[in-house]
Curated annotation (Swiss-Prot):
It comes from Saccharomyces cerevisiae (strain ATCC 204508 / S288c) (Baker's yeast). It catalyses: DNA(n) + a 2'-deoxyribonucleoside 5'-triphosphate = DNA(n+1) + diphosphate; Endonucleolytic cleavage to 5'-phosphomonoester. Its EC number is 3.4.23.-, 2.7.7.49, 2.7.7.7, 3.1.26.4. Mg(2+) 1 binds at residues 671, 736. This is Transposon Ty1-NL2 Gag-Pol polyprotein.
């Protein structure tokens, strides 16, 4: 290698002179256009200025004198790496003389070598042999040179008595192709520059700097002709030469112009990508350079955004600027201007430190022209660049590094040396070696030379105690240095390789030797003035010379930059070899490994562990003494600080100062726990706890939500409690940073009350230990209490409150006192406390009957907070009560030593413990009231009657209260335990009237009814009075349900005695039959009631099978259809004979007897007769929702009275517009541009980039060509936009969509349809999945539409980030929003499922696919898979992933309850057990956004509307703007209600459909009714559609439609019809609509309803048979006997009109042809009634609470 050869030559070349022929150093990454003469001239001036600072000798006169040529002095340039580079030439000065240019006529004589590619080359010296070069004209242009374009200049000074050497200039390569001409011109221009002809090269404007001479023109012509053969010239060059064959200048000018125009953009991009900055140039210049490049690129249409620009700039930062990469690389919104502010700050700090450096020489004013020499003994700090951050990290700027050396002997003193490097930089490979250095020399710690070094010189350092040098070629008598330690100003070690002598040969021919240390780890070669003074040499800075004490001048001193230098030419080279030095300093016996190196090698372990391991020889090869431990204590590894970052440690007991600083109840800790899932809405889901810092007193409060107002209420309560009860004011409240505490509402409240909030730091839960530990303790107690007592989970907060009471009374081990004692309260009286879950009997002071038992079993929870009573849970009523009327159940059968946990509370010790308290109650019980206080905040079922509790159980009513304790001993119960089967998800709608306590019938007379008694209809009315005493004496607290399946025969006139089973008895007792008249009397005068017996026991007595000529269903088919339907439970009624008045009722079609419940039957007749004795629940009253616009008419019926004319004065009811959905998406400006929520904005930006990347990945448009807007037909241009929204799972989504709403009709096929799965198909699939134990898997295909190609030629505007507003791109994929995208995707996925997955689409049901194992429901990009075998689903998923980006949302493999979010439905599914469908989370989020004032704290609505009122027909008198505003509001409200209703809330469809007809008639009345509906939805948002698995004993699928109609109750006398569809007893759909034709009778309306149900019933039947191969039974239930009769009849002559007859005949054909069973159902059990009319609260609940609750 060249570098190896040069390192062995004599250094005499340093003193040789050379004419300057190089005007600029050209780097490999230099702009190719930076060769113009103007730039060359600038560099020539800089070179001349540098040369003038050194003692030089004029060069040889062989150079032609030309005033435009560069100065003939030796050019000085900064060497790029390590030390001065010798000048290199390939053409002598004589050859460069214009007089000898004819030499180029003989190119073979030019010496040339392939590997000596430098433009200039100097031989090592006159004493070394010049190498023999092969003869060659030049290399072809296609052969790159290893160092092409690099120019190295001489850096040594020339003595006046030395002659210049010859110079060789390398010729340009040969041109070999016309395509390479411009590249060849670049090399040719460099050749001219090296030939000292840079001034004739044309500039950018085409003119040279000076005029060209004739000789130069000849030289130019000859060289151009030699190296650019005419056959390889491009055409435009030949055209120029054809005019003037000597016009080479024009060719050069034209070439430069072409290169500039063709490569400007590319050069700018390359320059920007290869930016480098380390502070060596002013920051302003660097900023100007970068901004100019970015501006040019932006002006040329290449937009560089801030993020990309900042990344390019930071990537090129080095030195002290490098840390900016790590401090700013995560800032998304960082701008170039902000980045340059940081760069300027560091640069100014560097300059300030440099300017503050003291000067080496004395102040001229102090010297007073004294030329006497002196020795500088001070130790000034000299600024040096520090490429790495120091350990102490005191400043980012470079610091002075004084170096001190010391021996390992006690007598060694420490001095300092300035200008040392700070940190070694390791070389990566041998190419990093510098010229003059052999590969065998140690290179692991070499550093880059500083830019301000004067090459070939030694730096004079007045503060250094030793001389240091990097090159070993001048060291004499080198030896190892085991006893020398060198440190810099920061006390960091500098490794020393060797110690030797440095010998000088000065101008007076004397030789002087001083000691020198060899190290490659410094920036400059340092010459210590202290060591020169030791040999009688001083530095005189007034004369700038080194001199002896006698005034003899030894050598000149050169000032370069801020420092003073002495030339190395006075040094005598040594004959020592470099390997010798390396062997000396790398001796294993002397070198110690630095601790940072060992620390990194041993996986960043700590120093203590490493030292211990070395001592115990667990790590071999080196010992503890081989490691330098001096920096181990203070060493900070930045990687460890980042990788091992931990939270700060909390000191135990550090919080004690707060206990001394604050008085009791002045410093509180608070925290919230929750939510607890799967609880009824009446039970709290959260609790908030408070703990006093000083007393440790604790409070807990239940919470149903974490809203601001709920938290504020609790804070207000506890602050008032502390203020009034303890006369203290809270000063500080410590809490975490949850949103419930950091909201503005609470902050203002605390500020208003003068309370200081104390928040924990981020992710520091340990700082909140008091509150966190309390919550953990209470939850542990809660789980234990519930486990021990067996109580249901919805009583969890009662266990929390019980634990709080106890914990406040227990003493702390530290303070030896309890929290109550600290607070000044008395201790807890344990005699008033019962174990949690203690079985008790509560007195019922108001039972349903006087002969019913007065005791109700319950479980004690905790002492009441608001009274002296106890909170007791009553499972039979599903309520908690606050009462003192209870008796503790005790039993001696279960002892503690038997470990029967169910009997632990029955021990007699409990009775002895509570004896005093019971005695106190007994003595005062006579004066107490029998009333019970119901705890309203945890009441599970407010609709239950509250008059069912009574006093404690006594043998007789006359037993005095004083015998309470004695009598209670008679009550014995073994192993009483709360029933675990109590559903924890119980809610208000779950409650039916309690089960019958006895099977004994009861007779109640008219008088008792009139006096306020209650009729009981849950027992037969034929039981004799004599049985009552037997019933009372044999009654127990729990009884079995009485079944009436055999109570009555099918004969309506003759009845036998009814067998009655007595609880606990073995004999059956009979009840004599009463007279027919008495039975009628009792029936007429009784109030209608509701029974809780199952449908299996009584429904068959009211079903009338219809047998057609074609179908004769068996009795088991009839029972099978009715058995599993969720029909309400009604009491069995004995067959009776109606009186004559009933026989004379008008015909069935008469308008006079039409009931609001529809149809005429026995039940309607009873209701009509007994309407004056309705119970309170049937009254048409309800709590008003607190909205200021509601008036006294707000609880109205949607059914108008018959006497009113129902005609609206606008056409709204005739043509209802489509309902507009609520806009849940955001535009780009809303989500990003003007979004003030920074966190949300960043998430939307991230979603934006994700969507753009997905579009590019899917090749949505053609990226090869952009079209001009003027060239494309406007009809084919589709506008595009970005929309943003937040999904239900909380993720942020961005979607690039097309504006299909303004798409031209010619751009899509209107016949194509976008199909999605029908909701009935989805519900059917879900129902079959439950019955057949299917696995349900939910999938999502990302960017589904983009997989479908688009056939039409469409163009869209590019996304905004591309910045091409005037361009268009052609679509290749079906973009979201296009009219045809849905259809294209449907066809794509359909073909894939059929061909690749072996599926087939169910005929008549689009998007439902099946094969032998799997069923798929497809809704755009969502897929729901149903399969008996989960592996079958996985197989389909694997196939889909081959083509589409398929995400598994829920695999559904768990056997426990799985939660899904399928098409808006929140589904809870447990295989083989149940499925629950609801929308609680969605409604909780969306309903408050409707701008409807909801009433969360008031009494909740029990029905969506009430019968009895009608919609007024008054004309609206409002202006146009208000009308549009109200219509828009109605569209939003009804839109959401309609979405929910048709999903699963089928009980609301009637109200939704009726209000939807009035969207364009937004009167105040209509709006109020709509608000009432929304309020009801809010109150019942937790309701769910409940499905249970079908009984496995029934192999058939049963599909049933229940039909109903309400005659003439709609505007224009239209009827409302409704149908409910059930599959295997599960409601899967419903429909409520206004009849399209005006019916003339109730029967006609019923026929119309049945005719609407049968087609859908048949379609569903086909779907069920396709998905499940079991046999299917189809049934239709209606409460119209006349409709059934018409369907059954064969008479065709009695139809009123042709339409009616056609409908009837069609029904007959469909019933007979489809094997359809038609049955009668009572109106009271017809659940389709809710689809056709508004119902009273009681009836509404009765018809819906079995299938939706």
């Amino acid at each position: 290698m060249e570098s190896q050869q040069l390192s062995q030559h004599s250094p005499i070349s340093h003193g040789s002179a050379c004419a300057s022929v190089t005007s600029k150093e050209v780097h490999t990454n230099q702009d190719p256009l930076d060769v113009s003469a103007s730039k060359i001239q600038e560099y020539d001036k800089a070179s001349t200025k540098a040369n003038s600072q050194q003692t030089t000798t004029p060069a040889s006169s062989a150079v032609p004198e030309n005033p435009h040529h560069a100065s003939p002095q030796t050019a000085q340039s900064h060497s790029p790496q390590n030390g001065p580079y010798p000048q290199q030439c390939m053409m002598t000065q004589n050859q460069a003389n214009p007089s000898d240019w004819s030499f180029y006529g003989r190119p073979s004589m030019i010496p040339y070598t392939p590997y000596q590619m430098s433009p200039m080359y100097f031989p090592p010296g006159p004493h070394s042999q010049f190498p023999q070069y092969p003869s060659s004209v030049g290399t072809p242009l296609s052969t790159p040179s290893p160092e092409s374009g690099n120019t190295f200049t001489d850096s040594s000074s020339a003595d006046s008595d030395m002659t210049s050497t010859k110079k060789y200039v390398r010729p340009p390569p040969m041109l070999t192709s016309p395509n390479d001409f411009l590249n060849w011109v670049k090399t040719y221009i460099k050749f001219l520059q090296n030939s000292n002809l840079g001034g004739i090269i044309p500039t950018v404007n085409g003119k040279p700097v000076r005029q060209i001479t004739d000789d130069e023109l000849t030289f130019l012509y000859n060289t151009f002709q030699i190296f650019a053969p005419s056959q390889f010239l491009p055409t435009w060059v030949k055209d120029i030469l054809s005019v003037d064959y000597t016009d080479i200048m024009k060719i050069l000018s034209k070439s430069i112009e072409k290169m500039q125009s063709d490569t400007q953009e590319a050069n700018d991009i390359v320059t920007l990508a290869n930016l480098q900055y380390n502070g060596s140039t002013p920051a302003d210049a660097f900023e100007t350079k970068v901004t100019n490049i970015i501006d040019r690129l932006n002006n040329n249409g290449i937009h560089i955004n801030n993020k990309v620009a900042c990344q390019l700039i930071m990537r090129g930062l080095s030195g002290e600027y490098k840390f900016l990469r790590y401090t700013r690389h995560r800032h998304l919104n960082m701008t170039v201007a902000e980045l340059f502010l940081d760069i300027h700050a560091i640069y100014e700090e560097q300059q300030g430190s440099r300017n503050s450096k003291p000067n080496y020489r004395r102040n001229p004013s102090d010297e007073k022209n004294d030329s006497r020499s002196y020795t500088n003994t001070t130790k000034p700090k000299v600024i040096a660049r520090n490429p790495q951050k120091t350990n102490n990290s005191k400043s980012k700027t470079a610091r002075a590094h004084n170096v001190s050396t010391s021996n390992n002997s006690p007598s060694t003193d420490n001095d300092s040396i300035s200008k040392s490097t700070t940190e070694p930089i390791q070389l990566n490979n041998k190419h990093d070696l510098h010229l003059g250095q052999k590969l065998t020399e140690s290179t692991v710690n070499h550093t880059n030379h500083s830019d301000d070094e004067l090459p070939g010189h030694l730096l004079l350092d007045s503060g250094a105690s030793r001389t240091l040098i990097r090159s070993a070629h001048h060291i004499h008598s080198a030896s190892s240095n085991p006893d020398i330690n060198v440190v810099d100003a920061q006390k960091r070690n500098i490794p020393i390789n060797a110690i030797g002598d440095l010998q000088f040969h000065f101008q007076d021919n004397t030789k002087t030797s001083i000691k020198v240390l060899h190290t490659p780890n410094i920036a400059y070669d340092l010459l210590s003035l202290n060591e020169l003074a030791a040999v009688d040499i001083t530095a005189c800075f007034t004369k700038n010379v080194l001199e002896r004490s006698d005034g003899t001048v030894l050598a000149p001193i050169v000032k370069y930059g801020d420092f003073y230098w002495v030339s190395k030419k006075y040094l005598l080279p040594s004959n020592i070899s470099v390997p010798t030095i390396n062997n000396v300093h790398t001796s294993e016996s002397t070198r110690k490994y630095p601790y940072p190196f060992i620390h990194r090698m041993l996986a960043h372990a700590n120093a203590q562990t490493i030292r211990y391991s070395l001592k115990n020889n667990t790590i071999t090869y080196f010992n503890e003494s081989d490691v330098d431990w001096s920096s181990a204590i203070d060493y900070q590894c930045p990687d460890c600080l980042i990788g091992k970052s931990t939270k700060h440690r909390h000191i135990k007991g550090s919080r004690l100062k707060y206990q001394n600083s604050y008085e009791p109840f002045q410093y509180l800790h608070t925290d919230i726990f929750g939510p607890v899932h799967n609880l009824p809405k009446s039970a709290p889901s959260y609790f908030i706890s408070f703990t006093d810092e000083t007393t440790k007193f604790r409070w807990v409060y239940p919470l149903h939500d974490r809203r601001e107002d709920s938290i504020l209420d609790v804070f207000t309560t506890i602050l008032a409690f502390i203020k009034n009860q303890f006369q203290a004011s809270v000063l500080v409240i410590q809490m975490d940073r949850g949103s419930e505490y950091t909201n503005r509402t609470l902050h203002k409240f605390l500020e208003k009350n003068g309370i200081t909030p104390c928040y924990t730091t981020t992710a520091d839960s340990r700082a909140h230990g008091v509150a966190e530990r309390l919550n953990r303790t209470l939850l542990d107690d809660c789980r234990t209490q519930l486990q021990c007592s067996g109580l249901p989970n919805h009583l969890w907060f009662s266990a929390i409150e019980f634990s709080t009471i106890v914990r406040n009374s227990l003493a702390s081990p530290k303070s030896k006192k309890s929290a109550r004692q600290h607070a000044g309260l008395a201790g807890l009286d344990i005699s008033t406390l019962l174990p949690f879950g203690q079985p008790v009997i509560v007195n019922d002071h108001n039972p349903n009957s006087k002969i019913h038992p007065r005791g109700i079993p319950g479980y004690a929870l905790h002492p009441s907070r608001n009274s002296y009573g106890y909170i007791i849970y009553l499972p039979s009523l599903k309520k908690t009560v606050d009462t003192t009327n209870y008796v503790i159940l005790q039993g001696k059968e279960s002892r503690l030593d038997q470990f029967n946990y169910d009997a632990l509370t029955f021990d007699e010790d409990l009775n002895r413990l509570t004896a005093s308290y019971q005695s106190f109650i007994a003595s005062n019980e006579i004066q107490q009231s029998d009333d019970l206080n119901f705890q309203s905040d945890i009441e599970l079922h407010p609709e239950q009657p509250r008059n069912v509790l009574s006093k404690a159980v006594s043998p007789t009513d006359s037993t005095p209260p004083s015998t309470h304790t004695e009598d209670s001993k008679r009550v014995s119960k073994t192993n009483i335990r709360a029933p675990r089967e109590v559903d924890p998800n119980i809610s208000k709608s779950d409650i039916l009237p309690s089960k019958k306590r006895s099977s004994t019938p009861q007779i109640s007379d008219i008088e008792s009814t009139g006096s306020g008694g209650m009729h009981r209809l849950d027992v037969p009315l034929l039981a004799p009075m004599s049985q009552s005493n037997t019933h009372e004496s044999s009654h127990t607290s729990k009884s079995k349900d009485f079944r009436h399946s055999d109570s009555y025969s099918d004969n309506e006139t003759n009845h036998t005695n009814v067998p009655i089973s007595s609880t606990g008895g073995t004999n059956n007792k009979t009840v004599p039959q009463t007279s027919e008249q008495e039975t009628e009397k009792r029936i007429i005068h009784r109030s209608p009631s509701i029974d809780t017996s199952s449908s299996e026991s009584n429904s068959l007595h009211h079903v009338v099978p219809i047998k057609t000529s074609d179908t004769c269903p068996k009795e088991n088919t009839e029972e099978s259809i009715i058995a599993d339907l969720p029909l309400p439970d009604l009491p069995p009624e004995p067959p009776t004979k109606l009186s004559d008045s009933f026989k004379e009722l008008p015909p069935i079609n008469s308008r006079q007897t039409n009931s609001s419940l529809g149809g005429i039957g026995d039940s309607n007749a009873y209701t009509t007769i007994n309407s004056k004795k309705r119970s309170l629940e049937d009254n048409e009253t309800e709590i008003k929702v607190s909205r200021d616009t509601w008036n006294t008419k707000n609880m109205r019926s949607l059914e108008p009275p018959r006497s009113k004319k129902r005609i609206h004065l606008i056409a709204a009811v005739k043509a209802v517009k489509s309902i507009k959905p609520i806009r849940t998406t955001l535009r780009y400006d809303e989500a990003i541009t003007y979004n003030k929520d920074i966190k949300e904005k960043e998430k939307y930006i991230e979603a934006y980039h994700k969507e753009v990347n997905q579009l590019l990945k899917m090749k949505t448009w053609d990226t090869d060509k952009y079209y001009d807007r003027k060239e494309i037909d406007p009809k084919r241009v589709i506008n595009s936009m970005f929309i943003f929204n937040r999904k239900r799972d909380g993720t942020h989504k961005a979607r690039f969509v097309a504006r299909g709403d303004i798409q031209h009709p010619d751009t899509y096929d209107s016949g194509m349809q976008s199909n999605t799965v029908h909701h009935y198909a989805l519900m059917t699939s879900l129902s079959l999945a439950l019955d057949n134990n299917y696995y349900i898997t939910q999938l999502d295909i990302s960017s589904a539409y983009l997989y479908a190609d688009i056939k039409e030629e469409l163009y869209i505007r590019p996304p905004p980030h591309l910045g091409m507003n005037d361009k268009l791109i052609r679509l290749k994929k079906s973009l979201y929003g296009l009219k045809q995208s849905g259809a294209n995707w449907y066809e794509t996925i359909k073909s894939y499922l059929i061909e690749q997955c072996d599926m087939e689409e169910v005929r008549g049901w689009s998007c439902v696919f099946k094969n032998s194992q799997v069923t798929i429901c497809l809704f755009v990009d969502d897929m729901i898979l149903f399969s008996k075998d989960l592996n079958a689903n996985k197989k389909i998923i694997t196939t889909l992933k081959k083509q589409y980006d398929t995400k598994i949302i829920n695999l559904g493999e768990s056997d426990n309850e799985i939660q899904y979010d399928i098409l808006g439905l929140e589904i809870k599914y447990q295989r083989s057990k149940y499925m629950k469908l609801g929308m609680e989370k969605s409604l909780t989020e969306k309903l408050p956004k409707l701008n409807v004032h909801l009433n969360p704290k008031g009494k909740k609505l029990s029905a969506p509307g009430q019968p009895g009122l009608y919609i007024d027909q008054d004309e609206l008198e409002i202006d146009e703007d208000e009308y549009k505003e109200k219509v828009h509001e109605m569209q939003k409200l009804i839109g959401l209600a309609s979405y929910v209703g048709y999903k699963f809330r089928f009980d609301l469809l009637y109200y939704i459909n009726t209000l939807a007809q009035h969207i364009l008639f937004p009167s105040r009345q209509v709006l109020d009714m709509t608000y009432e509906l929304i309020q009801f939805m809010w109150d019942t948002r937790d309701k769910q559609l409940i499905w249970h698995k079908n009984k496995p004993t029934k192999p058939d699928n049963k599909l049933v439609a229940i039909s109903d109609a309400s005659y003439g109750n709609q505007p224009y006398y239209k009827s409302q019809i409704g149908n409910i569809f059930l599959l295997n007893g599960k409601v899967i759909g419903g429909k409520s609509t206004k009849a399209s034709l005006t019916c003339t009778s109730t029967t006609e309306a019923e026929i119309h309803a049945v005719s609407e149900a049968i087609p859908l019933l048949n379609n569903l039947s086909h779907l069920v048979q396709e998905l499940n191969k079991k046999p299917i039974i189809k049934g239709l239930l209606t409460d119209s006997r006349s409709t059934i009769s018409i369907i059954k009849s064969t008479n065709e002559e009695k139809f009123r009109n042709r339409f009616f007859g056609t409908k009837a005949m069609r029904l007959r054909d469909e019933v007979s042809g489809n094997n359809l069973y038609v049955y009668y159902i009572e109106t009271k059990k017809n659940i389709a009634d809710v689809m056709t009319k508004p119902l009273p609260i009681k009836t509404f609940k009765l018809l819906t609470n079995k299938w939706i609750h």
